[in-house]
A protein has these predicted regions:
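Active-site activation/catalytic loop segments of kinase-like enzymes and analogous catalytic loops
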Residues: 412-473, 490-504
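A glycine-centered beta->alpha junction motif in the catalytic cores
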Residues: 13, 254, 280-315, 339-355, ...
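Conserved alpha/beta core of the MobA/IspD/sugar-nucleotide pyrophosphorylase nucleotidyltransferase superfamily
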Residues: 2-5, 159-244
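Active-site acidic catalytic loop and adjacent metal/ATP-binding pocket
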Residues: 241, 370-420
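Conserved core of the sugar-phosphate nucleotidyltransferase
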Residues: 111-185
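Conserved N-terminal catalytic core of the sugar/cofactor nucleotidyltransferase
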Residues: 2-7, 15, 29, 33-103
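Conserved kinase catalytic-core helix
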Residues: 266-272, 293-358, 363-380, 477
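ATP-binding glycine-rich loop module of kinase domains
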Residues: 234-262, 281-296
Length: 521
């Protein structure tokens, strides 16, 4: 018989706080893919999965269909999934019709290292922990479960922490207990049905367990599962890039963002990967052979990349967009968006626009700095085909094929899918040379924001410093305006500060403001 596995994902994941604002708790990232991927891949390829859907359930379904088109999933909608009448027991009862056979139950925040045995017997999984108070426990005698206790009732060493993983062989007995259990069954979940097995035999199985259901435990799991040499992706709450089974899946909470990304992939054909699947909040493409430029860059290779970019930028826009409308778009994209993002930064991080010195240098308010910029000069862009987020972490180099591939292209430029400003791409390249994503991911920076002073410092790679020097001379040699590139680079830091995690956000703001003030001098 094919193994059937029940994974309830209906809950809101409130213990994870802001991490589940935009995604279901099973889609929270761990080792550059959702926790749910780690669960799915613990089971044989022919296993069938019964998924209880609730909070942001459409995202769970869409992800599974994109990531695992050759696996079998059965879905049950849970309503209500929060508030009065909700509970894990309700999620299970909604799945009953698909679980009329022995099955595995696994919580969507449970990861284990060991192979998971089939439900040839009734069994419950446990792990050794130092503090039992926050877990349901089971009393184990001679390898068998003789009692199941609610939180705070277990005692070391006789009781073991139940980890939300179990084999249900006697499913008919289980379902009878769940249906007759009323509110207690709804609240207790699978444990209510499992209590019906006591006296009939429940094996206790030990596992190396990683809980991902609360922030401290999730952090431990992320550390344990982290692989060296992985991609350097700076975390955002409303976006993600997942690597699953040779595929790359891009998520955003913004459906227009995803739709336009997919449309632009066709416009950038030959420079970016081909999109192979699209859902409302995600798209998929095959993983591309190569290494990110930040890992392999040398000055000669950087020069080769810039030659490739010149070819990319050489295409004139096909639309009839005139210079005035393009400049208006640049004004909206640069000026209006900057003021909006600065306000968002102050709101997100509870800061005010002040005159704090930055690294010992006196500073006016950021509003003063922005008001004094020559926005007409900044908005006088160069309309061409564009990438929109062109930095080394978004560029792959295949030494074998001698080919560059651009990744994570921007969805639009001031509403246009076809035409952007070459200066923005140049500034994006510059911003990645100054701030190395790899070193930021390793927390190799410092920032301190006090009442009257901001201090920051960051590590840089010598090769990127050399590339920056070369880039500045290349910009001038090829007829571009270096001052404009550096001014836009500073604006980029100010713009993205609102979108990144604390305290990196403070570093970006301090760097952007100080760089902008210095460029103005």
């Amino acid at each position: 018989m094919v193994m059937r596995v029940c994974i309830p994902t209906a809950g809101t994941g409130s213990r994870l706080k802001g991490l589940t604002k935009y995604v279901n708790k099973s889609l929270v990232g761990l080792d550059n893919r959702p926790i749910l991927s780690h669960l799915i891949e613990q089971f044989p390829p022919d296993a069938e999965f019964v998924i209880a859907l609730g909070h942001k359930g459409h995202l769970v379904r869409d992800f599974l269909e994109l990531a695992y088109p050759n696996r079998t999933f059965l879905y049950s909608q849970v309503d209500p999934f929060e508030g009065e009448g909700s509970g894990l027991g309700l999620s299970l009862l909604k799945c009953k019709e698909h679980l009329q056979q022995p099955f595995i139950f696994i919580s969507c925040d449970t990861l284990v290292r060991e192979p998971i045995p089939p439900p040839e017997k009734n069994w419950m999984g446990y792990a050794e922990v130092d503090d039992l108070t926050q877990y349901r426990t089971m009393l184990v005698e001679k390898g068998a479960v003789v009692d199941i206790c609610e939180k705070t009732l277990g005692r070391i060493p006789t009781h073991k922490a139940y980890i939300g993983l179990a084999g249900i062989k006697d499913y008919e007995i289980f379902w009878k207990a769940m249906e007759e259990g009323g509110k207690q069954a709804i609240d207790s979940g699978e444990a209510h049905g499992q209590r019906a097995f006591i006296g009939r035999g429940i094996d206790a199985h030990a596992f190396t367990w990683f809980d991902t259901g609360n922030p401290p435990a999730l952090e431990k799991a992320r550390t344990a599962y982290e692989k060296s040499g992985g991609p350097n992706i700076l975390e955002k709450t409303n976006e993600a890039i997942w690597f699953v089974d040779g595929q790359v899946i891009k998520f955003s909470d913004d459906q227009t963002f995803i739709a336009n990304r997919a449309k632009r992939a066709a416009l950038l054909k030959g420079f970016v990967p081909e999109i192979t699947g699209v859902k409302s909040n995600m798209y998929r493409y095959a993983e591309v052979e190569g290494r990110v430029m930040s890992d392999v860059v040398t000055v000669p290779l950087f020069e080769k990349l810039l030659q490739h970019c010149q070819t990319f930028w050489s295409e004139e826009p096909k639309s009839d967009q005139d210079k005035v409308s393009f400049k208006n778009g640049c004004m909206k994209f640069y000026k209006d968006k900057t003021f909006e993002r600065v306000d968002l930064f102050f709101k997100n991080f509870e800061k005010k626009d002040g005159t704090e010195s930055i690294n010992g240098v006196s500073m006016p308010t950021v509003k003063t700095v922005l008001d004094n910029l020559d926005w007409n000069w900044i908005a006088d862009g160069l309309p061409r085909r564009f990438h929109g987020d062109l930095h080394f972490e978004n560029i792959l180099w295949s030494g074998k094929k001698q080919v560059f591939t651009f990744l994570d292209w921007r969805q639009d430029f001031a509403g246009s899918l076809t035409t952007g400003d070459v200066y923005y791409d140049l500034a994006k390249l510059m911003h990645g040379l100054i701030v190395c994503h790899e070193l930021i991911a390793q927390d190799m920076y410092q920032v301190k924001w006090e009442d009257k002073a901001i201090h920051f410092d960051l590590h840089r790679k010598q090769m990127l410093v050399e590339c920056e020097r070369f880039f500045e001379s290349w910009i001038v040699k090829n007829g571009y305006d270096l001052a404009k590139v550096r001014t836009l680079t500073a604006l980029i830091y100010l713009n993205i500060a609102a979108l990144h995690h604390y305290p990196y956000s403070l570093l970006l703001f301090g760097l952007g403001k100080s760089m902008l003030a210095n460029e103005k001098k």
